[in-house]
């Protein structure tokens, strides 16, 4: 009876394996909330009898991000390209020869004469080795986007640390863009924007997860074979 149930057990395991292959909705990638690292802001200092507060923005300029909690828009325009070529060529050619015209008179013996042994050409060898190798690699990337970020730290020298992110989900495909870095208030334009090439220690990531991302990766069995395949 036990042997007859084996096909039933195998069928159940097969159905369970198929159920595990069903497409599931990818979880949303959580972006750290910028407000978590905001420093406590002290209240603005006001002077009695004064109509102008020196802690506020200038009367003659547009309002730009300058304090913790303010928002600034980053215009991301990143282009990168790199290429490298290498070639190697080596060669080696060597030869060796030896003769023994006189060897204790044995060169005149019948053994040498009957076998037609030439004592002047006893040893001869040559070796030649050639190697040629060439390789090239190239990589390029382009990223264009506009991302609103928030000031999370204001340093004593006036520089600002910003951080922001955005999630977009279309047809179960999640696209996440994240940015953090340090900027100078003087680089912020009148429209409260700043270019990404003016960000210090910029960390920009653009990732995706979903059906398209899964199709761009090899299966688990292929990846396992790549690790153990010796050829």
From Swiss-Prot:
Record InterPro entries: Flag_Lring
Membrane topology: Lipid-anchor
Keyword annotations: Bacterial flagellum, Cell outer membrane, Lipoprotein, Membrane, Palmitate, Signal
Lipid tethering residues (S-diacylglycerol cysteine): 21
Subcellular location: Cell outer membrane; Bacterial flagellum basal body
UniProt subunit comment: The basal body constitutes a major portion of the flagellar organelle and consists of four rings (L,P,S, and M) mounted on a central rod.
HAMAP family, per the entry: FlgH
Name by which UniProt lists this protein: Flagellar L-ring protein
Lineage: Bacteria, Pseudomonadati, Thermodesulfobacteriota, Desulfobulbia, Desulfobulbales
């Amino acid at each position: 009876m036990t042997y007859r149930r084996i096909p039933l057990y195998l069928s159940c395991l097969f159905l369970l394996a198929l159920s595990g292959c069903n497409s599931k909705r990818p979880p949303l990638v959580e972006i750290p909330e910028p407000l978590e690292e905001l420093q406590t802001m002290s209240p603005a200092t006001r002077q009695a009898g004064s109509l102008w507060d020196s802690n506020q923005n200038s009367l003659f300029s547009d309002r730009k991000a300058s304090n913790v909690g303010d928002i600034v828009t980053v215009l991301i325009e990143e282009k990168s390209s790199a290429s490298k070529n290498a070639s190697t060529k080596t060669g080696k050619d060597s030869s060796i020869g030896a003769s023994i015209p006189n060897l204790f008179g044995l060169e005149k013996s019948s053994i040498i004469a009957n076998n037609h042994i030439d004592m002047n050409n006893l040893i001869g060898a040559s070796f030649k080795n050639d190697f040629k190798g060439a390789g090239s690699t190239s990589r390029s990337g382009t990223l264009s986007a506009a991302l609103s970020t928030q000031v999370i730290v204001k340093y004593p020298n006036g520089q600002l640390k910003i951080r922001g992110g955005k999630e977009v989900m279309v047809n179960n495909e999640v696209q996440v863009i994240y940015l953090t870095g340090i900027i100078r208030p003087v680089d912020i334009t009148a429209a409260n924007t700043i270019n990404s090439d003016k960000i210090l220690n910029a960390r920009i990531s653009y990732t995706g997860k979903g059906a398209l991302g899964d199709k761009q990766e090899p299966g688990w069995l292929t990846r396992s074979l790549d690790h153990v395949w010796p050829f």
